[in-house]
Design a protein with these regions (language model features):
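Acidic, Ser/Thr/Pro
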Residues: 18-125
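N-terminal signal peptide c-region/cleavage motif recognized by signal peptidases
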Residues: 11-15
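Short helix-onset patch at the extreme N-terminus, typifying the N->h transition
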Residues: 6-8, 61
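Cleavable N-terminal signal peptides
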Residues: 5-6, 16
Length: 125
C-alpha cells in the first residue's frame, strides 16, 4: 500500500506539470526556448508597470494557442489572444501595473518547440 501511495504521489506532478518561467531581464532583453509536451502549456511571466511597452516575438515548430494575459481579482484580461498560430509578434502596452504572462497551450499530441524573445521599450517608442 505504501508503494502505491508513493507512486501516486510521484505521478501527480507529472499530470499537472506545466512550465512557468519568470522573466529575468538582461539589458532590456529576455529570450527563452522550451519544448511544450502534448496537452501542456508554457507561461513566461513578469511584472510590468502601466505604460510599459514590451515588444514580443515567437516562433514555434508547430501551431499552438497563444495569449498574453493578466489577472484582475477572479477575472482574466487578455491583451492578446490567438488560436492555432506557429509564429507571431507584436507589442504589449501595459494598461495597468500587473504581472503579465505570455502563454502557449499545446493542444496537439506532439511536442511543440517554442522560441520567444521580449524587448523592453520606453513608452512612446
Amino acid at each position: 500500500m505504501r508503494i502505491a501511495a508513493l507512486l501516486l504521489t510521484l505521478a501527480i506532478p507529472a499530470v499537472v506539470h506545466a512550465d512557468i518561467v519568470d522573466i529575468k531581464w538582461n539589458d532590456g532583453m529576455f529570450s527563452h526556448k522550451a519544448s511544450i509536451a502534448p496537452k501542456k502549456f508554457l507561461e513566461v511571466c513578469g511584472k510590468q508597470k502601466k505604460g510599459d511597452n514590451v515588444g514580443w516575438q515567437f516562433k514555434g515548430s508547430a501551431p499552438s494557442d497563444f495569449n498574453i494575459h493578466y489577472h484582475v481579482g477572479k477575472d482574466v484580461a487578455y491583451p492578446e489572444n490567438r488560436k492555432d498560430v506557429a509564429s507571431a509578434d507584436g507589442t504589449l502596452s501595459a494598461p495597468v501595473d500587473q504581472d503579465y504572462c505570455w502563454m502557449w497551450s499545446n493542444r496537439s499530441v506532439q511536442a511543440v518547440d517554442i522560441e520567444v524573445n521580449l524587448k523592453q521599450a520606453k513608452p512612446g517608442k
